[in-house]
A protein has these predicted regions:
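Conserved N-lobe ATP-binding subsite of Hanks-type protein kinase domains
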Residues: 69
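Cyclic nucleotide-binding regulatory domains
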Residues: 374-436, 447, 463
Length: 484
């Protein structure tokens, strides 16, 4: 039973709401908005920026919400820009609101250094300042997805599906850490911009997170009405499928230019969430297939049991839309990150790599396409680049005689990479492309750019390769006729 819904009348479709079983005054959102600073110290004058927030040098203001301000700062110790979200001092304010703000801060502060995923904003630091506590986060060059929900700024279908895939993988990672975000919405998804184009997405703002492993009393029934699942609105027990509903609602909004449920009156909005079915997306966008609509509608099912069973299943359904050409290819004519990720997952070399490490390889590796007959290596050449075959095949020739054929998932050139001196780095055979091949490659310099955990997995993979080759060499010596 809902005791109270707190949001601005007439703004039900976009309002951030907090639901408690006790009466209180209207609680403002704790989520920083995309708006410019609107808190002047004097009429018509913006407040002066602080020079520092703790040890962080203030460079400018990124935005503000009802209870907090977000500043662009520089961390001189680590030599990086950061985003600092500082709770705005509110002396004499409502005590109950202050307590809830403290809990939101504590929920996010508990995640310092815990979430390490390329599509999740990192939380570097949290300082419980008695006047104005603040959270220090990774600074993302871009903006939220809110502008792309407008009918005149809609993204291409392929990009929306790609964003959905990355968010599903990231939220799956978050859930494996024992966390449910509970406020998945466009304003909490940051679009990473490179030369004005969206190249990645990151999930942010974990103030509403539900920690399934925490014994500390947590605030329940929080979220944004347009993206809240029925069970979250009920205050019922939640699992990953509640955030799944939220992501489905975000994707629906990005595709249609309006959320799945839309009402000016809050009570009508709640009724729709409980009882109405989202309108079909078919016909709302040119080129949108029934398969796309089916995936989104399943994520938005009223009953959690009718949604996808887990995040991997949801992510796979989104990926299949691209692989099966259910989404028209527009501006992203190249290979998408989701396609590369799934390709790596299928390769034997990467069997021990987790999702986080695979994403790192997707972004750090050099991806190359080679035509039939191309010489990847020539005997006598020196080099330390190693390749892992993602697609296609290579043939190895020694003194003009074919001695091996290498297929997908096989590494080549790792001996020269691992060799301790230049003489041993000379290739002992010709390696020629026998079927058009896609490879990913690293050098010692590019491999050092990977996180230590990812480099360790490469070392383990190299050891497995060397053990297999030593075993094959032993078999060749023991049974020469069998090998020949």
């Amino acid at each position: 039973m809902i005791a109270a819904l707190f949001c601005t009348p007439g703004l039900a479709r976009s309002a951030n709401i907090v639901i408690w079983p006790v009466p209180t005054s209207s609680l403002p959102s704790h989520i920083p908005a995309d708006s410019a600073a609107l808190n002047p110290a004097l009429p018509g004058a913006a407040p002066a920026l602080p020079t520092h927030i703790g040890k962080y040098r203030v460079l400018g203001k990124l935005g503000e919400g009802a209870t907090s301000d977000v500043f662009l700062c520089h961390d001189d110790f680590h030599g990086r820009d950061v985003a600092v979200k500082r709770v705005r001092p509110n002396p004499g304010g409502d005590a109950s609101e202050a307590r809830y703000s403290e809990r939101f801060f504590a929920a996010e502060a508990a995640l310092v250094g815990r979430l390490q995923h390329p599509n999740v904003v990192q939380i570097f630091d949290a300082v419980a300042d008695p006047v104005a506590p603040y959270i220090v986060m990774e600074h993302v060059a871009g903006n939220t997805l809110r502008p792309y929900c407008r009918a005149d700024q809609l993204l291409s279908l392929e990009l929306i599906v790609e964003i959905g895939f990355k968010c599903a993988m990231a939220l799956g990672y978050v859930f494996r850490q024992g966390l449910i975000h509970r406020d998945v919405k466009p304003a909490n998804l940051l679009a990473v911009l490179t030369h004005g184009a969206i190249t990645d997405v990151k999930i942010t703002d974990f103030g509403s997170v539900l920690n399934l492993e925490s014994e500390v009393t947590q605030v329940y029934r929080v979220g944004s009405l347009a993206y809240m699942s029925p069970e979250q609105l009920d205050g019922a027990a939640l699992d990953c499928r509640s955030d799944m509903y939220g992501l489905g609602a975000v994707l629906y909004h990005l595709i249609a230019g309006r959320p799945p449920f839309d009402a000016q009156v809050q009570a009508a909005m709640v009724h729709q969430v409980y009882n109405a079915q989202p309108a079909s997306l078919c016909g709302m966008r040119s080129g949108l297939s029934p398969a796309v609509d089916a995936v989104i509608q399943r994520a938005l099912a009223k009953n959690p049991g009718d949604r996808f069973d887990n995040w991997d299943q949801f992510a796979q359904a989104l990926s299949d839309l691209i692989l099966q050409r259910q989404v028209p290819r527009g501006q992203l004519q190249g290979v998408l990150d989701s396609e590369r990720f799934n390709l790596l997952r299928s390769l034997d070399f990467f069997t021990s790599f987790g999702d986080v490490e695979l994403w790192e390889v997707v972004h750090r590796a050099k991806w190359q396409r080679f035509n039939f007959g191309h010489a990847l290596y020539r005997k006598g050449d020196e080099g330390r680049t190693f390749h892992i075959i993602a697609q296609g095949a290579l043939e190895v020739f020694r003194d003009g005689q074919k001695v091996a054929q290498l297929g997908a998932g096989t590494s080549v050139g790792e001996m020269a990479y691992l060799a301790p001196n230049p003489e041993l780095r000379r290739h002992s055979a010709d390696v020629i492309v026998s079927q058009p091949a896609t490879t990913i490659s690293f050098t010692p310099d590019t491999l050092t750019q990977l996180a230590p955990g990812c480099r360790h997995l490469f070392d383990e993979a190299f050891i497995r390769v060397l053990v297999r080759r030593l075993h094959a060499a032993h078999e060749a010596l023991a049974h020469p006729r069998r090998i020949l």
